[in-house]
Amino acid sequence: MTDKEDFIVQEAYQPTEEEKQAIKELEDKDQGLVAGDWNSQKTYIKSFKKNLRNDMYKKQNKLCAFCRIHVPSACVPMHREHIVYKNKHPQWTFLPENLCVACPSCNEYKGTTEVLVDPQTSTYPNVGDGFKIIHPLYDRYSDHIELLGGVLYRGKTDKGVFTIEKCHLHRVGLAEERADQKMYMENKGSIIAELILLTTISNHYVDDQDDFIRYVMDIVEGYKLKQVKDNV
């Protein structure tokens, strides 16, 4: 795992005064904040959401909070992610500490998952121990998840296992994306040898071992053909 992937966000997004006022107006309604307020068309609520995504995208090194894969913003924009599901805890809908960015897949798989250790708490936890899932502001990723060969996700703690399960980090496409990135950045021969070794344990770490093995074998065949052409 690289230092870039192993980030802890040092500071949540800091709303502008206008954004704070717009949020306060929603909080001061008779019924208080409700999850649907997230879709408010108020100018400064819209700017809050835009600015938050841009800010957290940079602070997260342009990586998803949960899988730590880069998603180019020009292709598929990162989703704004409520770490604690807003429908269950609407009082934290606009709390910057409860907001990060995540790739569309992790966001969808995590869905409505309850991530609080104490779901009845009325105070938002300010330490990682309050969450069952890795929190990008409070948890060091490598304390909870190991990347085997930089490709396969293995939980080191209950929190790591929970994050892998709920965000479906054992999806085979994620392993293949990580392998693709390594092939661009490192010595191809040594990486291929490592990938072949990973196929022997991949049944524990990907949801489709056959697909992963086929993927690696295709890489091997492509590498062999290139070697032959280079030697002609």
Regions found by a protein language model. Give the residues of each.
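Short cysteine-rich loop/turn motifs with clustered Cys
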Residues: K50-P77, C103-C106
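Extracellular structured ligand-interaction cores
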Residues: N61, P96-N98, R140-H144
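Short, charged surface segments at domain edges that flank catalytic/cofactor-binding sites
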Residues: K20-L63, K88-T93
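Domain-level detector of nuclease and nuclease-like folds
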Residues: G111-I191
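Histidine-centered nuclease catalytic patch
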Residues: R68-V101, Y109-P125
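Long, charged N-terminal interaction/targeting segments
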Residues: M1-D28, V232
